[in-house]
């Protein structure tokens, strides 16, 4: 079961987003992570008192099954009742039960930057009480560093590197999307900005993120999710990797694809770290735009120039070709909607967040702000893929030139 859940507004953290100086990002991230860790730790006496204050005459399994039926938007309030409920809601067993009952929900997290503020902040897409889609700030999470890389594993997001002033960050932060708590993880050996990152076989591979690649063994670092240890991987590296900041990256068929300024690279961890040299002879870079996502091991991206006659195209890694995503309703979307937007896989559908105001002409259709388009995909005979606009909503309105930095989805 895939839907967008109604959730309460979590934006009141006592901070005015217009007054967050960029130089406080690192400090605030660490402070929030430390605060979240401290909140999870209770004195032994207090924990015992909490456990004594709530008595359950029914088995734990039945309690878990009952809680699984409750909307996830009510979990934050329920977790504050006692340590029992806090631990239950943070447990993996509860979400396995929700999945087994067909109650899992897909959530979209977006990094939104306001015109006069730095950096971006986390927002979550939800449906309000009148069934309209809205973006609501998640105030308990730290700001999003510019140029960071984000990967999702289960119900967690890993925020890697980024830029603070002119300094490349070595940090990696774990965000638990079940509880909106975060904590710091071991740092990388090198600071990275606009690095490529992907998860293959329980390991996070982080590649590049430097101005220029130096002849050392730290161009690729790997984080083992079990041991929580970083490891540097030696070369050889492809000659085309001199410029190592990537505007987009994706994982398809357990291979990490990277879009550079001049070349595309493909790294294969399962083949002893081999590089697919044949990708240089394919049209991959011709149409790959930073607004992209992967659905069923195929790369979808926007094409504002409509090279193949349609605004969205899809790359098939097996035959290494681009094909159009057909559909009359896609033509109703203005071309400038795709120019500064982000795309995500929302339970097999495409979600695109973007501005409905042209940065060039100032043209605007409808309410100014961030708009969300939901596109249903259909595979037809002959391998053709068709798209149908399922909904188009203004999700964060009445503000000019909002910027969507990234968006991620995960199922909880």
From Swiss-Prot:
Keywords: Kelch repeat, Repeat. InterPro entries: F-box/kelch-repeat_ARATH (IPR050354), Kelch-typ_b-propeller (IPR015915), Kelch_1 (IPR006652). The keyword Transmembrane helix does not apply. Residues 1-55 are annotated as: Disordered. Residues 16-26 have a biased composition (Basic and acidic residues). Kelch repeats lie at residues 156-202, 203-250, 255-291, 292-345. The keyword Plastid does not apply. SMART domains: Kelch. PANTHER family: F-BOX DOMAIN-CONTAINING PROTEIN (PTHR24414:SF65), F-BOX/KELCH-REPEAT PROTEIN SKIP4 (PTHR24414). This is Kelch repeat-containing protein At1g19470. It comes from Arabidopsis thaliana (Mouse-ear cress).
């Amino acid at each position: 079961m895939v839907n967008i859940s109604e959730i309460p507004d979590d934006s009141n953290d006592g901070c005015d987003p217009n007054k967050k100086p960029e130089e406080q990002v690192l400090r605030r991230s660490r402070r929030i992570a430390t605060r979240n860790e401290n909140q999870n730790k209770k004195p032994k006496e207090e924990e015992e008192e909490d456990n004594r204050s709530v008595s359950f005459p029914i088995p734990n399994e039945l309690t878990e099954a009952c809680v699984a039926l409750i909307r996830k938007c009510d979990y934050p309030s329920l977790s504050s009742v006692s340590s029992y409920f806090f631990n239950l809601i943070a447990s993996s067993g509860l979400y396995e039960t929700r999945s087994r009952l067909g109650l899992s929900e897909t959530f979209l997290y977006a990094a939104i930057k306001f015109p006069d503020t730095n950096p971006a902040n986390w927002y979550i897409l939800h449906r309000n009480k009148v069934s309209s889609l809205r973006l609501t700030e998640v105030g308990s999470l730290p700001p999003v560093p510019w140029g960071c890389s984000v990967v999702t594993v289960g119900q967690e997001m890993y925020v890697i590197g980024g830029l603070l002033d002119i300094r490349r960050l070595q940090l990696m932060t774990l965000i638990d999307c079940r509880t909106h708590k975060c904590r710091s993880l071991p740092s990388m050996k090198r600071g990275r900005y606009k690095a490529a990152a992907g998860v293959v076989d329980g390991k996070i591979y982080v590649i590049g993120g430097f101005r220029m690649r130096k002849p050392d063994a730290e161009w690729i670092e790997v984080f083992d999710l079990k041991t929580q240890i970083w490891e540097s991987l030696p070369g050889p590296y492809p000659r085309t990797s001199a410029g190592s900041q990537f505007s987009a990256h994706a994982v398809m068929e357990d291979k990490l694809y990277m879009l550079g300024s001049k070349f595309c690279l493909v790294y294969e961890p399962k083949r002893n770290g081999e590089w697919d040299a044949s990708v240089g002879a394919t049209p991959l870079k011709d149409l790959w735009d930073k607004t992209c996502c992967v659905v069923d091991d195929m790369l979808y991206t926007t094409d504002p120039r409509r090279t193949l006659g349609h605004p969205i195209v899809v790359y098939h890694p097996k035959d290494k070709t681009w094909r159009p995503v057909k559909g009359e309703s896609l033509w109703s979307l203005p071309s400038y909607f795709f120019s500064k937007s982000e795309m995500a896989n929302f339970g097999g559908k495409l979600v695109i967040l973007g501005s409905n105001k042209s940065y060039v002409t100032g043209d605007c259709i409808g309410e100014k702000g961030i708009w969300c388009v939901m596109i249903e995909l259909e595979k037809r005979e002959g391998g053709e893929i068709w798209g149908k606009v399922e909904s188009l909503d203004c999700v964060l309105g009445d503000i000019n030139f909002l910027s969507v930095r990234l968006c991620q989805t995960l199922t909880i």
